[in-house]
Amino acid sequence: MALTPQDIGRIANLARLELSPAESERMLTQLNGFFGIVEKMRAVDTAGLEPLSHPVAAIQDIALRLREDTASEPDQREANQRSAPAVERGLFLVPKVIE
């Protein structure tokens, strides 16, 4: 699947983007490169292969080194909220933006 300059123009219009001719050409090259990679991946025969839930699951000998989940800095909530125009029960209040 290869995109045309018209496809890029339509995508840019749908995304409300205004692309210069150079940006449009670069986008065309990048997207066609991406679709080329996807086509190569689709060409690989994966029949009979069990899907992996996680790539590391294929290698049983790897021991993940996860650190302890601990706070590394003191709680600065009150100090950070002093400059806020409105705070309620420890949360920043913001104006409603969606009707």
From Swiss-Prot:
Its EC number is 6.3.5.-. GO terms for molecular function: asparaginyl-tRNA synthase (glutamine-hydrolyzing) activity; ATP binding; glutaminyl-tRNA synthase (glutamine-hydrolyzing) activity. It comes from the Bacteria. InterPro entries: Asp/Glu-ADT_sf_sub_c, GatC. Keywords: ATP-binding, Ligase, Nucleotide-binding, Protein biosynthesis. Coiled coil: none annotated. One of its GO terms (biological process) is regulation of translational fidelity. The keyword Protein biosynthesis applies. It catalyses: L-glutamyl-tRNA(Gln) + L-glutamine + ATP + H2O = L-glutaminyl-tRNA(Gln) + L-glutamate + ADP + phosphate + H(+); L-aspartyl-tRNA(Asn) + L-glutamine + ATP + H2O = L-asparaginyl-tRNA(Asn) + L-glutamate + ADP + phosphate + 2 H(+). Heterotrimer of A, B and C subunits. Belongs to the GatC family. Allows the formation of correctly charged Asn-tRNA(Asn) or Gln-tRNA(Gln) through the transamidation of misacylated Asp-tRNA(Asn) or Glu-tRNA(Gln) in organisms which lack either or both of asparaginyl-tRNA or glutaminyl-tRNA synthetases. The reaction takes place in the presence of glutamine and ATP through an activated phospho-Asp-tRNA(Asn) or phospho-Glu-tRNA(Gln). This is Aspartyl/glutamyl-tRNA(Asn/Gln) amidotransferase subunit C. The lineage of its organism: Bacteria, Pseudomonadati, Pseudomonadota, Betaproteobacteria, Burkholderiales.
